[in-house]
From Swiss-Prot:
Record-level GO cellular component terms: mitochondrial outer membrane; mitochondrion; plasma membrane
Alphabetized UniProt keyword annotations: Mitochondrion
Keyword Glycoprotein recorded: no
GO BP annotations listed: negative regulation of cell integrity MAPK cascade
Disordered as annotated region, ranges: 34-123
Lineage top rank: taxon: Eukaryota
Name of this protein: Uncharacterized protein C4F10.17
Keyword Mitochondrion assigned: yes
Length: 123
């Protein structure tokens, strides 16, 4: 019976005149949604279309030359990078971090051992 009463109360509340404004608001927002989406798409494509327009003025040879230059610059940067030194530095950093963390863990276990057992016992 309670279930039926709840269904009837919900049905009456859904058709209540006080909720017509909510339904009207939902209906209006659903009608306005496609317009808002189209405006957002226009804004997004506006930015992209400006980039396309900028590239449209450049000749294919000029774009190819820019691509070649960027590839050369990337290759030069890769060649100039000292990977062995970077690997050594990374190894040192990892070792330092590991030793620091292990010291912290040892200190914590000592403190916990002292609190529990009344001190750290050597075996």
């Amino acid at each position: 019976m309670a279930f039926r009463a709840a269904r009837i109360a919900f049905a009456w509340k859904a058709t209540n005149p006080a909720n017509t404004t909510i339904r009207q608001y939902i209906k209006e927002t659903l009608e306005e949604a496609p317009e808002k989406i189209s405006q957002t798409v226009k804004k997004a494509t506006g930015k992209a279309s400006k980039k396309i327009d900028e590239n449209k003025d450049k000749s294919p040879q000029e774009m190819a030359e820019n691509a070649k230059q960027s590839v050369k610059q990337t290759a030069k940067d890769a060649k100039d990078t000292d990977y062995q030194q970077k690997a050594k530095d990374a190894g040192k950093k990892i070792k330092e971090e590991f030793s620091q963390r292990s010291e912290n863990v040892l200190e914590e276990t000592r403190r916990e051992g002292m609190n529990r057992d009344g001190g750290v016992k050597k075996e």
